[in-house]
Design a protein with these regions (language model features):
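N-terminal hydrophobic/helix-forming segments and targeting peptides
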Residues: 1-351
Length: 351
């Protein structure tokens, strides 16, 4: 069972849009929810910082942005993360064919709505009818019926609601699920610091975090980054309640912090697995079949460790999900409850 207060909060946050690079109105919503729970909230470029009475006791981070579209011209819409990340041939940093292949067709018949990026004001609704690759810009273009009046720079979010289905919750969970968990921590009396970052899906959030730590952090700073972790099937996702990592494609994580999470899981009887080890084991099988190995993945934690030269260290805690980056992404209720229990115990353990 989920705490009714958490469930109510999650429903509210899911309904508010937060498209990559258009998170400002969502930060307003988070500010209200956090201040109602007693947090001191400060805005910086690309990051909303919420602090309790003992800010240095424990620090968590979660990215606030979600996938969506951006209007880039008359009746023209592109994948917002690609636009925000400047991932076009114009800068010799094109989107890979593999990545474009995942996006094309994924959102067909998806209901969407446009909003004003600063206020969140509703600007009309539509439906995605088609997506294709533009050969001139090597980027994905979406056809949206109903938003012909949208002007360039208008974000377009996926229409979404929280659904309960056979012991699982479904919505565009990445990353509103861990955002809600972080806000809920303040309901439970959290005294530390929570960072809510922008543009993670475009690979930029770590820059905003690092800038804050360079300005306000100590000589060393331990951070726990919260996120979802994708699996191909519900069966695979259900094999563990929590996903940990020792590293990602960018850097090794803090061993002591990772071991602490493992210890807390073991003490509470929470099943877990290491995603990097899981992928590496899969790659052994793929290579034996002559197939291309998969990447162990790139995370906000790895990016900031790699770039900070020892200033920021830490590890990740993730919720296993299926239906990645869609409005049908799902997580087991048991996993979500275990996740909230785990980070609550971690916060208490750090104080």
């Amino acid at each position: 069972m989920l705490d009714p207060q958490f469930e109510d909060l999650l429903r509210v946050l899911i309904r508010h849009p937060s498209v990559v690079a258009a998170e400002h109105s969502y930060f307003r919503v988070l500010q209200r929810e956090l201040e109602e729970r007693g947090a001191n909230v400060t805005w910086y470029e690309g990051v909303l910082v919420a602090q309790g009475s003992d800010p240095s006791s424990c620090m968590f981070s979660a990215h606030a942005d979600r996938h969506g579209l951006m209007c880039t011209g008359p009746n023209e819409f592109q994948f917002a993360a690609f636009v925000a990340g400047n991932r076009t041939d114009l800068l010799n940093n094109s989107v890979s064919e593999q990545l474009m292949g995942k996006v094309i067709g994924r959102y067909e018949n998806q209901a969407v709505f446009a909003y004003e990026p600063w206020s969140g004001m509703y600007r009309g609704k539509g439906i995605i009818t088609n997506s294709r690759v533009c050969p001139y810009r090597n980027n994905v273009i979406f056809d949206v019926d109903g938003l012909q009046s949208a002007v360039a720079g208008t974000p377009v979010a996926f229409q979404d609601n929280l659904v309960f289905n056979d012991g699982r919750i479904e919505a565009q969970l990445d990353n509103v699920l861990t955002i809600a968990a972080l806000v809920h921590l303040f309901t439970l009396g959290f005294k530390g610091t929570a960072f809510f970052t922008a543009e993670e899906e475009a690979g930029k959030s770590w820059r905003y975090l690092l800038e804050w730590f360079r300005r306000f952090g100590g000589s060393t700073n331990q951070l726990y980054v919260l996120d979802t972790s994708p699996y191909d099937t519900i069966e695979a996702a259900n094999e563990q309640l929590i996903v940990l990592r020792e590293k990602d494609a960018n850097a090794k994580f803090n061993e002591a912090a990772t071991n602490k999470i493992q210890r807390l899981c073991e003490e509470a009887g929470i099943s877990f697995m290491y995603k990097d080890k899981f992928v590496e084991q899969q790659n052994v099988k793929l290579e034996a079949l002559g197939e291309k190995p998969k990447s162990i993945g790139s995370t906000e934690m790895g990016r900031i460790i790699s770039a900070s030269n020892g200033l920021v260290d830490g590890t990740t805690i993730q919720i296993p999900t299926t239906g990645y980056h869609t409005t049908a992404e799902s997580a087991s209720i048991e996993s979500v409850a275990a996740f909230i229990s785990l980070i609550s115990k971690l916060a208490l353990d750090e104080t």
